[in-house]
């Protein structure tokens, strides 16, 4: 039994979302359009967790569909968004997705570290 418990604990630790891995994925996959602190092709992400979709300060490039979606960026909605933005909000403008659930969890863990808006 102890070996099974150790194996389960190791698997759980390996599967736990990792903000450092998420930051690396974010830098590789997201920074062509996004930044934590500056709007670009896409909106800045600092403070995204818990924010209403389509409301990042100073960003004017949102689709009408996203602005009207009523979504609040929580773990479940971010996961669905990153997996397939068009299915979640038809008519939105984001052109990429992350198919791997582990990568999505890591990116979401990283986004949570950007909780406070930079003033």
Identify the residue ranges that each predicted region occupies.
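Sequence/structural segment immediately N-terminal to covalent heme-attachment motifs in c-type
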Residues: 16-40, 45
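Soluble non-cytosolic domains of exported or imported proteins
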Residues: 20, 24, 39, 68, ...
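Short Fe-S-cluster ligation motifs
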Residues: 58-79
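C-terminal capping alpha-helices of c-type cytochrome domains
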Residues: 74-119
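A generic structural signal for secondary-structure junctions
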Residues: 38, 49-53, 83-86
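Electrostatic cytochrome c docking/interface patches
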Residues: 2-25, 118
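Short glycine/threonine-rich turn/loop motifs
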Residues: 19, 43-64
């Amino acid at each position: 039994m102890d070996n099974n418990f150790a194996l389960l604990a190791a698997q759980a630790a390996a599967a736990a979302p990792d903000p450092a891995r998420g930051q690396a994925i974010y830098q590789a996959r997201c920074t062509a359009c996004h930044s934590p602190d500056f709007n670009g092709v896409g909106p800045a992400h600092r403070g995204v967790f818990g924010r209403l979709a389509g409301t990042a300060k100073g960003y004017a490039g949102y689709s009408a569909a996203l602005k009207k979606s009523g979504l609040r960026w929580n773990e479940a909605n971010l996961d669905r968004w990153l997996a397939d933005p068009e299915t979640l909000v038809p008519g939105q403008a984001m052109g990429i997705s992350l198919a791997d659930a582990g990568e999505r969890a890591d990116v979401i863990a990283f986004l949570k570290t950007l909780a406070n808006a930079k003033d």
